């Protein structure tokens, strides 16, 4: 019996035919794990989702001839994946949906609604809160507090380095050797970083937005930019989603608004309604721990458990915020990181990005994505914390991950499946530069 290797295809690559033969392979030998290495595959691919399919040829052969079986190997999950593109200061962020598709959908919507009675606006467009998303808003708020409190404790046992000249950070006992510093006097240091201690704001980007008492009210003017408080963008999204915080009150309507124009409305009369009774929150709100109460984990088991809880809080916050963004619109400037939680952006002329003079400092508002609201700080993934240091010549073999994920991974947490491709956990790293030059 001979098996002919017909094609091997991974996600994003077209199949290629490379014929070779394996003689006298029985079913038991074929299912043996050692056969995986005799096919010429890397040992790192053994844990991947690889599908083997054997196809018999339809032609009849003589009794003395051996029948050839084409072997097709397919991988549903990519072995490695590039990070999202990082745009320079001179580039504008692309629209999540192309503007041509938006215009086409708008024309189709006007055509379908022609000569039809207007439907009542659903929440939150009618000024009311989506009641089914209120528990989710509380869950996202508490997940953010748990994430911050746990990171304070983990950063006492997992070293996080920050460059003193730029905003780059590195998770590990010492900084990486790559020449990627873009701060002042970088030419004198030849692009090398000067690593110092980091704080929690280096890991979680402190992205703030204006707090709106009425999300359907008038837009914030330029002269009001200092009189309106600013809160973390995720917190503002949770407040508009139904979270009650005494320091940041919000207007809660009990009747839908009455539209009198495209951009004009009046509030419905609520005088005949009884006074609302104060209701307890679905879950109690957590608070951030003071600095004096932050203690490192006492044992290795506690460190691993804390890392798992931190990673779970990170995933809950991102997944819940993504669901809230589907109902409560979030706007982002296409030129700078400014975020506004609301149906339309504010009018504050504080954009200092590329060619802001031509726009008189006004922001170019567009729909935001999850990474605009919760930007992940990508850092280099250290394959072995206790092993040899990272080499500058092997930079293309190392992967990257969000700083929170890398901290939890070095603390002992299991890396989620959707981060393994960018971290390149299944890519073999050469031990030396000479071995890397031998890689085809």
UniProtKB/Swiss-Prot annotation:
Query: This protein is called what?
Result: APO protein 2, chloroplastic
Biased region (Basic and acidic residues) positions are 106-115
Lineage, uppermost ranks: Eukaryota, Viridiplantae, Streptophyta, Embryophyta, Tracheophyta
Top-level taxon of origin? Eukaryota
- PANTHER family according to UniProt: EUKARYOTIC TRANSLATION INITIATION FACTOR SUI1
Q: What does this protein do?
A: May be involved in the stable assembly of several 4Fe-4S cluster-containing complexes of chloroplasts.
Primary residence: plastid
Any one Gene Ontology molecular-function term assigned to this protein's record: RNA binding
Keyword Transit peptide belongs to the record: yes
What remark about domains does the record contain?
The APO repeats may provide ligands for 4Fe-4S centers.
Q: Which UniProt keywords apply?
A: Chloroplast, Plastid, Repeat, Transit peptide
| Native species | Arabidopsis thaliana (Mouse-ear cress)
């Amino acid at each position: 019996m001979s098996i002919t290797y017909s094609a091997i295809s991974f996600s994003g690559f077209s199949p290629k035919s490379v014929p070779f033969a394996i003689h006298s392979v029985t079913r038991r030998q074929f299912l043996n794990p050692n056969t995986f290495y005799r096919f010429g595959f890397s040992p790192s691919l053994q844990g991947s989702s690889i599908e083997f399919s054997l196809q018999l040829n339809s032609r009849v052969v003589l009794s003395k001839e051996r029948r050839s079986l084409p072997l097709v190997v397919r991988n549903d999950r990519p072995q490695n994946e590039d990070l999202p593109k990082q745009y320079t200061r001179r580039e504008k962020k692309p629209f999540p949906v192309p503007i041509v598709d938006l215009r086409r959908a708008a024309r189709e919507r006007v055509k379908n609604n022609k000569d039809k009675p207007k439907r009542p606006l659903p929440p939150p467009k009618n000024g009311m809160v989506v009641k089914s998303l209120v528990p989710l808003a509380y869950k996202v708020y508490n997940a953010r507090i748990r994430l911050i409190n746990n990171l304070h404790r983990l950063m006492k046992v997992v070293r996080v380095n920050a460059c003193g000249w730029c905003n780059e950070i590195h998770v590990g006992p010492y900084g990486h050797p790559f020449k990627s510093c873009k701060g002042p006097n970088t030419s004198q240091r030849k692009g090398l970083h000067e690593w110092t201690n980091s704080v929690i704001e280096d890991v979680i980007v402190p992205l703030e937005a204006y707090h709106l008492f009425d999300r359907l009210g008038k837009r914030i003017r330029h002269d009001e930019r200092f009189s309106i408080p600013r809160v973390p963008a995720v917190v503002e999204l949770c407040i508009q989603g139904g979270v009650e915080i005494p320091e940041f009150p919000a207007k809660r309507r009990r009747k839908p608004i009455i539209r009198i124009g495209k951009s004009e409305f009046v509030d419905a009369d609520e005088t005949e309604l009884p006074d609302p009774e104060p209701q307890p929150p679905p879950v109690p709100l957590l608070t951030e721990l003071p600095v004096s109460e932050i203690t490192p984990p006492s044992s290795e088991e506690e460190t691993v458990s804390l890392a798992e809880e931190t990673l779970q809080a990170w995933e809950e916050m991102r997944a819940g915020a993504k669901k809230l963004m589907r109902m409560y619109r979030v706007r982002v400037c296409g030129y700078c990181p400014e975020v506004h939680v609301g149906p339309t952006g504010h009018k504050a002329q504080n954009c200092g990005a590329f060619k802001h003079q031509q726009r008189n400092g006004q922001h170019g508002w567009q729909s935001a994505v999850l990474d605009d609201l919760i930007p992940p700080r990508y850092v280099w993934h250290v394959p072995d914390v206790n092993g040899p240091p990272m080499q500058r010549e092997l930079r293309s073999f190392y992967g990257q991950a969000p700083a929170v994920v890398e901290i939890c991974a070095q603390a002992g947490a299991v890396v989620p499946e959707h981060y393994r491709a960018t971290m390149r956990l299944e890519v073999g790293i050469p031990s030396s530069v000479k071995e890397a030059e031998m890689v085809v």
